[in-house]
Amino acid sequence: MAVDVSECLAAEPRRAILIGMRPVAIIGIGKTAFGAFPDRDLRSLAVEAVRKSMESAHVAPGQIEAFYLGNFAGPSFVGQNHLAPYVASAAGIHGVSATRFEAACASSGSAFFHAWSAVAAGIYDVVVVAGVEKMTSQPTPVVTEILASAGDLGGEIKAGATFPALFAMIARRHMHEYGTTREHLAAVAVKNHANGAKNPDAHLRKVITLEQALAGKPVAEPLTVYDCSLISDGAAAVVLAPLERVAEFTDHAVVVKGIAQTSDHVALDEKDDITTFRAVRTAGEKAYRMAGVGPSDIEFAEIHDCFTIAEIIAIEDLGFVAKGEGGPYTAEGRTCLNGEKPVNTSGGLKSKGHPVGATGVAQICDSWLQICNQAGERQLRRHSLGLAQNLGGSGATCVVTILGAAA
């Protein structure tokens, strides 16, 4: 029977985008350690990650056809603009399109999405996607102010609200609506620190107890210092190529099965419900549909835990658990390394660190390590299908990527 393609595309608009697009693979990764590095500048961190990714992919700088850089606030943190060619040229990549992407903490996730789009569409074959941030060159109050610029200038920033304050409001509302407790928040921190302690590249390789997490220095009630991600320096990079060309470069490749970038209001008070991130739900739904899988098929996830409540909400919004069940699910140990749905095997932003412009690509790198059976002490038994979720602001941008082993 003949099929009316136009009817199919009308019923499934996302499929129209994908017709004629090529499967894309990650053929190499590279990253720096995350931490506080007073003797390193932004460019040296980014170049280290880029060069490592090209070495991993067995490609030379002259083979790179485009360069994508995620960076949130290089001009504010280190006073340098025009960052993409600044980094690309230092890594030996010349004469190609070099573009910086800014989407708050989802900057490199956004860069990855646009790089994937270009390779999938056949515009380029071999590209590098990097993310970098150098944050510790500024004192903490200045860093907090720079980060707050990803909020709403006319309301939140004018009122003096920082992101710890905004996520504290989110946490309080989630507690009110669903009975989430401080113990549930602390369980996220304890689990992620345990994972990060096994990650040689993590910023804070320190195991903590539930009691320590609960007794942490208050930041914004109910959040303590243990509920907040770290101020870090670091960089990460990947090399993308069409799946059909993988054999030319490597026998270690990971395929992008599904991907989506979505957006929502920047201001928290413009959202209908602050106990959910609509951008996460929408990106997850689109990525699942593209990959042809559902939440139950995902074997592990790298989740954007900028604050512990963000991880709890994300695993609910991504369909891993029902709304309101994220806290108990975590406290029961079901997201631990040996749990049914391991989350943040890298240590997450809480322990691995959060150089904001690097985080999205770093999540991709950590997922690649799991799928390629190279995660060391943190290696999972079930690791063929993973998900990375990168969030910007208080949920204004989200990139969800589903990654799987190459057949």
Predicted regions and their residues:
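Extended C-terminal subregions enriched in glycine
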Residues: 277-280, 285-308, 317, 349-352
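Conserved active-site "lid/cap" helical segment
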Residues: 18-106, 174-181, 203-209, 279-297, ...
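Beta-strand segments within the central parallel beta-sheet cores of soluble alpha/beta enzyme folds
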Residues: 61-71, 98-103, 127-131, 183-190, ...
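Conserved catalytic cysteine-centered active-site region
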Residues: 20-21, 25, 74-127, 134-166, ...
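Condensing-enzyme catalytic core mediating Claisen C-C bond formation in acyl metabolism
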Residues: 19-43, 153, 187, 218-282, ...
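Active-site-proximal alpha-helical scaffold in enzymes
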Residues: 102-133, 165-198, 238-244, 352-375
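Short glycine/threonine-rich loop-to-helix capping motif typified by GTGT followed
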Residues: 74-82, 268-272, 305-328, 339, ...
